[in-house]
UniProtKB/Swiss-Prot annotation:
Monomer. GO terms for biological process: cellular hyperosmotic response; trehalose catabolic process. HAMAP family: Peripl_trehalase. This is Periplasmic trehalase. The keyword Nucleotidyltransferase does not apply. Its EC number is 3.2.1.28.
Amino acid sequence: MKSPAPSRPQKMALIPACIFLCFAALSVQAEETSVTPQPPDILLGPLFNDVQNAKLFPDQKTFADAVPNSDPLMILADYRMQQNQSGFDLRHFVNVNFTLPKEGEKYVPPEGQSLREHIDGLWPVLTRSTENTEKWDSLLPLPEPYVVPGGRFREVYYWDSYFTMLGLAESGHWDKVADMVANFAHEIDTYGHIPNGNRSYYLSRSQPPFFALMVELLAQHEGDAALKQYLPQMQKEYAYWMDGVENLQAGQQEKRVVKLQDGTLLNRYWDDRDTPRPESWVEDIATAKSNPNRPATEIYRDLRSAAASGWDFSSRWMDNPQQLNTLRTTSIVPVDLNSLMFKMEKILARASKAAGDNAMANQYETLANARQKGIEKYLWNDQQGWYADYDLKSHKVRNQLTAAALFPLYVNAAAKDRASKMATATKTHLLQPGGLNTTSVKSGQQWDAPNGWAPLQWVATEGLQNYGQNEVAMDISWHFLTNVQHTYDREKKLVEKYDVSTTGTGGGGGEYPLQDGFGWTNGVTLKMLDLICPKEQPCDNVPATRPLSESTTQPVKQKEAEPTP
């Protein structure tokens, strides 16, 4: 006797399953064809631990980036022979056996530059090339030049780069945009995903998935050819984020995938390792030791996963905002990540259609629609009136409002009535004289009050504009630009983060001194300058008085989600 034909809901469930099984093979194939470079804590074992614990360098990243002058196994053998000998000098041993990273030259801009001129002049200063690296270097080679954030950093970072690329495009450097997309595609083909940054010690995690948005940006210049060219890499990245989904039962999690009790599929941040981060070794060990009630490996994994989120660190991940050792990133389903996954699915549908595969496009649309329903069901706090993260331990949406709540608006996944409530919540709780607060909590962590970060300012601005909430959107842009301009007027630089409780002050907190440069601030500043000033009268500095522009009255016409029932 024939089995009954599957019902419509069963058919809908079969479509994503097919996609996940097909793409799991892509992820495995990418991993099998590459030899993963070992991070320095594995290559050097006890020597790495001893050097970092000795605090030979003010910044723990210094030794993580040091290049062994010979085979690490030989260096380690020499160390074991010499370390207990009388008069052994660890610093001298390191200086003899390693090439330490050079301090970046401090950039002194020409006098009298406008804000726009300063940013345009920085692009070549921040550009690096690493087609070839030393054999045991933690730096991973990339085929094309790339733009680093600036300051402390010698490598390219994943999610930073999207906002940097917005500025490159605004400056007309489409060649650099294309180079950076090609580099990230190379990483996907080589490692199966885009690591946090191009360092061996970042390979165990990724960052907020903006690659599909980068390809979409490039398509503004190159048309559908860009979408078709990078469709395979977008599919591989999607496979990475959904790896393990085909074996999940309801209520289970596997790496970056979460399957809730009703079968809803969402994602979380995850790092494959559960050891201290090489670039913050001593700090991570101290954090783990400060909470003996939790396994150290669990704390290490959650610290690493918070780094994967880009929000390292924030009260958003903690039970107690004043105690970093209470963070539990892996038991939280983030609203921003799932918004980006929704956007990835939508762009994959568009790219599949451009490539002539309508059946595959429909499957991605099905996945996007299912995720959108999941966002509305699990990542909306109806009592508070804003989007928020979901807690896997309490099985409830969290109460905290953060700037991540604007991501559903940014990717056009929000219901129209909820977007209106988000505008009210943003203006009431997050908008400050110097821009948008990251959260309203003062924890001393850098992704909390009073700090404001350029990418979140842009996500909020564009997200609110997508739903016609132009007044609040323009308030955010104007407040943040004023902050950037005041800081530039005083210090002649753009910085990584800003204190938004006032104007003209760089932000605090974090694991390293405030950085200048700064890639994503440069990009967002250029976008906002063009937003507040009329096209016929572009401004090179932030005007002394707020101009009226078409943007303040005309909403950006985007497709909106239907109101929630």
